[in-house]
């Protein structure tokens, strides 16, 4: 019996059943692809051909990203969880809310969606207004280690909120999740745009990097920072804030 339970738990962690349930997995992957595509298309569309130094532009960009993500959470949250961000997927992976194989597929389609969204923006935007397609880059004077810490910190805030929203002990959320996530995104953008462009999302940075020109300088910052921040936030929430009840029917996996 113990051996059978161990095998079943291992299968859940790896996600064999998730992948073999083809109808469900394809719906989830389609939702993640379309969600990330729209995030990048609408979000980065708000900052093509503008100077980030303009104060009103910073507010516009922050609100656009916050609103589009809140919209996507409402649209596809019930389908795939609306990760649309590899850092979110990694943060939920370490807390057992998603299996390994499913997480890998999510990250792949998120990157594909981001590339497609940025490509569409490039096609529909006149050349004189494209700029860098809202590619994230470090501001003058911001070193890669500084950028890494900024991205890790703001992503920590986002994933801590996501973990709270996903906590199955909470019964008081109602329909607040989209608003909460949107506000967190807006807040972090307002704080960090002038440092790193406020990515918090490797796919969001990857799409414009693929479609733009001369755009890979310090790109690692936008993968390492958010993923580290997301993983640390996931571990922190699970260790400090998520109650462990012996009688509860856990919806997560024990690693």
UniProtKB/Swiss-Prot annotation:
Protein name (record): Aquaporin AQPcic
Gene symbol of the encoding locus: AQP
Matches recorded under InterPro entries: Aquaporin-like (IPR023271), Aquaporin_transptr (IPR034294), MIP (IPR000425)
Cellular compartments annotated: Membrane
Organism: Cicadella viridis
Cytoplasmic side: 1-29, 82-103, 163-172, 237-255
Main location: membrane
Gene3D superfamilies from the UniProt entry: Glycerol uptake facilitator protein
Domain notes: Aquaporins contain two tandem repeats each containing three membrane-spanning domains and a pore-forming loop with the signature motif Asn-Pro-Ala (NPA).
Family of this protein: Belongs to the MIP/aquaporin (TC 1.A.8) family.
């Amino acid at each position: 019996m113990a051996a059978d339970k161990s095998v079943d738990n291992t299968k859940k962690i790896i996600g064999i059943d998730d992948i073999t349930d083809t109808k469900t997995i394809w719906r989830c992957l389609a939702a993640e692809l379309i969600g990330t595509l729209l995030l990048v298309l609408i979000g980065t569309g708000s900052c093509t051909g503008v100077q980030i130094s303009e104060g009103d532009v910073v507010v516009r960009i922050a609100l656009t990203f916050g609103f589009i993500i809140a919209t996507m959470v409402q649209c596809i949250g019930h389908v795939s969880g609306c990760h649309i961000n590899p850092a979110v997927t990694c943060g939920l992976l370490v807390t057992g809310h998603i299996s390994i194989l499913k997480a890998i597929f999510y990250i792949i389609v998120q990157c594909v969606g981001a590339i497609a969204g940025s490509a569409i923006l490039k096609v529909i935007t006149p050349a004189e207004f494209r700029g860098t397609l809202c590619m994230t880059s470090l501001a003058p004077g911001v070193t890669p280690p500084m950028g890494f810490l900024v991205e890790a910190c703001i992503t920590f805030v986002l994933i801590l909120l996501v973990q709270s929203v996903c906590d199955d002990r909470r019964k008081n959320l109602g329909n607040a999740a989209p608003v909460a996530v949107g506000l967190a995104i807006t807040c972090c953008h307002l704080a960090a745009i002038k440092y790193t462009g406020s990515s918090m999302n490797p796919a969001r940075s990857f799409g414009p990097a693929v479609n733009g020109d001369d755009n890979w300088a310090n790109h690692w910052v936008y993968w390492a920072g958010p993923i580290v921040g997301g993983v640390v936030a996931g571990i922190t929430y699970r260790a400090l804030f998520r109650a462990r009840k012996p009688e509860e029917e856990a919806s997560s996996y024990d690693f």
